[in-house]
Amino acid sequence: MTPLVLIPGMMCDWRLFAPQLEALGRRPVLLAAPTKHDTMEGLAAAILAFAPPRFALAGLSMGGIVAMEMLHQAPERIERLALLDTNPRAEAPEVQARRIPQIEKAMSGRLRAVLRDEMKPNYLANGPDRQRILDLCMEMAIVLGPEVFARQSRALAGRHDRQAALAAYRGPALVLMGVEDRLCPRDRHELMHSLMPQSRFVVVEDAGHLPTLEQPDAVTRELLAWLEQPAT
């Protein structure tokens, strides 16, 4: 059974995938922590260093960006690829510019304010679990702390466009997004699907940027189906 490497998004940990982990049964799963480097290249290389020789790879948001960098660095090791609520392009200059004051604010002891006012409110669709998920996101972020926030922010700001890596990939692929994702909108996912025409493109209703938590059953079904596809 092919091992699965899961990469969470910015300022998230294994709990981002907690509902899916329960459904994966006896499949070997490695939960990556992209927290120790401030470049996308460094984050990807660190995960590749401990990953199995060949594996299935899934990442959400920043985790998807790290996954695409891993695909660029070691395409022969990735048996199948799932990209959730993410973006293959380099960071836009206007977003880069916003990161500097966010880092300064977080490092001055105001990480909670950065997350509350500038980031997390845009993550989720409206729904009965919205506040519970927001609280979980805040808890994960506070545990990781401002230094991780700064490193991840710098890695995102300096990342490269990885469309060419996707276009060259031929393995089973899943592109999935929440219909109300405002951070990584639909056109980014349609682009990834067009670059990997063999991929399945799924839009999850009643979900925003974190469908693994907002609509866990729907996401779990799609991930299990992706894992069961024949390898090429």
Segments and roles (model prediction):
Residues 1-46, 60:
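Conserved HGGG/HGGXW glycine-rich cap/lid loop of the alpha/beta-hydrolase fold
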Residues 59-63, 67:
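Gly/Ala-rich beta-loop-alpha elbow adjacent to hydrolase catalytic centers
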Residues 72-73, 77-117:
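Flexible "cap/lid" loop of the alpha/beta hydrolase fold
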Residues 91-94, 110-168:
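Conserved alpha/beta-hydrolase catalytic His-Asp/Glu region
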Residues 169, 175-177, 181:
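Short beta-strand/loop motif that positions the catalytic acidic residue
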Residues 171, 185-194:
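Short alpha-helix in the alpha/beta-hydrolase fold that links the catalytic acid
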Residues 190-209:
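Catalytic histidine neighborhood in serine/cysteine hydrolases
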Residues 207-220:
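Catalytic histidine-centered segment of alpha/beta-hydrolase-like enzymes
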